[in-house]
Amino acid sequence: MIANGFESMDKERVRKRPRMTWDEAPAEPEAKRAVIKGHGSDGRILSPPLRDDDRDGHYVFSLRDNLTPRYKILSKMGEGTFGRVLECWDRDTKEYVAIKIIRSIKKYRDAAMIEIDVLQKLVKSDKGRTRCVQMKNWFDYRNHICIVFEKLGPSLFDFLKRNKYSAFPLALVRDFGCQLLESVAYMHELQLVHTDLKPENILLVSSENVKLPDNKRSAANETHFRCLPKSSAIKLIDFGSTVCDNRIHHSIVQTRHYRSPEVILGLGWSYQCDLWSIGCILFELCTGEALFQTHDNLEHLAMMERALGPLPEHMTRKASRGAEKYFRRGCRLNWPEGANSRESIRAVKRLDRLKDMVSKHVDNTRSRFADLLYGLLAYDPSERLTANEALDHPFFKSSS
């Protein structure tokens, strides 16, 4: 599952890949029988009729269907490459849960079993239970792996989107960053590399929020309001792409906007690729915009150089055969000569240096945040901060 979906995600210039969609439950059809839907006349809980999967292997359901006698389907929460997430009622525990129903295709089933194995490892300590989503149960139903999770709040991306991409306050970014780094440090201790860190895979524990007046005012001098989470508690989700060893790997991983240079250059990757993603995420939470909004490898590298300076020669000279075409004379990036459009050149030119972009959102006196980002976004993985080193950074020791 590691490389699944990356090609299609990169085809169009969009801010990010297609997002999970959140649906309202349609009105329940009138029952033709005077019995509770999903129950027989004798009160027994009935299974839904056998239905063919859709052409993509997704489980076909109706709201208020039973998913085994234990779970009742209430609404569709989201959909992704892997399958669908449904909100369900757990009749045994009397609580709402989120059930991830995997497509009935072998590669997705295999990835789901890897995720289950990872989730079982993560809950063996308090760190895993408090920082990573908890799996409550799993089962195989009509050739679909179903993973039952605690029901959490919206993702950080969804929260940003609903707030019209208004940046989070720096104090909240600090809180999120600390928790995220603790989660990843714990995973790395277990020799696990997440490989797909992004705001969509970081969920607020609670859906509650507070509305506060914004500093911005309209032309009519009206006060604008913004929403902030009532609690800053977050949990990491989606371990279907997690790698369970400490070897150097050469496959394509990470969602485009959070992909590290060693992956693009084909140099091999390990734990450090997660830290690059965290650097991109923290920038996005602080500014409301993805740092590298691109769909093309050469443009992506050009954006990196624009924001962070030239790529190290010792890395460009070792680029894989597939990445050699992005360079002239072995080390200089073939830009803008190799650009595939004028719009691509303009997109790169719109970027400023990282510290200048940060300073537009963070007071210049708070340079510790920019310094942390430079440490997380070091080109050379061996020079990049580890999760534990990042947690010791002065940014997390201050309250201003």
From Swiss-Prot:
<feature type="domain" description="Protein kinase">
    <location>
        <begin position="71"/>
        <end position="396"/>
    </location>
</feature>
<dbReference type="Pfam" id="PF00069">
    <property type="entry name" value="Pkinase"/>
</dbReference>
<keyword id="KW-0067">ATP-binding</keyword>
<dbReference type="GO" id="GO:0004713">
    <property type="term" value="F:protein tyrosine kinase activity"/>
</dbReference>
<feature type="binding site">
    <location>
        <position position="100"/>
    </location>
    <ligand>
        <name>ATP</name>
    </ligand>
</feature>
<feature type="binding site">
    <location>
        <begin position="77"/>
        <end position="85"/>
    </location>
    <ligand>
        <name>ATP</name>
    </ligand>
</feature>
<dbReference type="GO" id="GO:0005524">
    <property type="term" value="F:ATP binding"/>
</dbReference>
<feature type="active site" description="Proton acceptor">
    <location>
        <position position="196"/>
    </location>
</feature>
<comment type="similarity">
    <text>Belongs to the protein kinase superfamily. CMGC Ser/Thr protein kinase family. Lammer subfamily.</text>
</comment>
<keyword id="KW-0547">Nucleotide-binding</keyword>
<feature type="region of interest" description="Disordered">
    <location>
        <begin position="1"/>
        <end position="29"/>
    </location>
</feature>
<dbReference type="GO" id="GO:0046777">
    <property type="term" value="P:protein autophosphorylation"/>
</dbReference>
<dbReference type="InterPro" id="IPR011009">
    <property type="entry name" value="Kinase-like_dom_sf"/>
</dbReference>
<keyword id="KW-0808">Transferase</keyword>
<dbReference type="InterPro" id="IPR008271">
    <property type="entry name" value="Ser/Thr_kinase_AS"/>
</dbReference>
<dbReference type="GO" id="GO:0106310">
    <property type="term" value="F:protein serine kinase activity"/>
</dbReference>
<dbReference type="GO" id="GO:0004674">
    <property type="term" value="F:protein serine/threonine kinase activity"/>
</dbReference>
<protein>
    <recommendedName>
        <fullName>Serine/threonine-protein kinase AFC3</fullName>
        <ecNumber>2.7.12.1</ecNumber>
    </recommendedName>
</protein>
<dbReference type="InterPro" id="IPR000719">
    <property type="entry name" value="Prot_kinase_dom"/>
</dbReference>
<dbReference type="InterPro" id="IPR051175">
    <property type="entry name" value="CLK_kinases"/>
</dbReference>
<keyword id="KW-0418">Kinase</keyword>
<keyword id="KW-0723">Serine/threonine-protein kinase</keyword>
<dbReference type="GO" id="GO:0004712">
    <property type="term" value="F:protein serine/threonine/tyrosine kinase activity"/>
</dbReference>
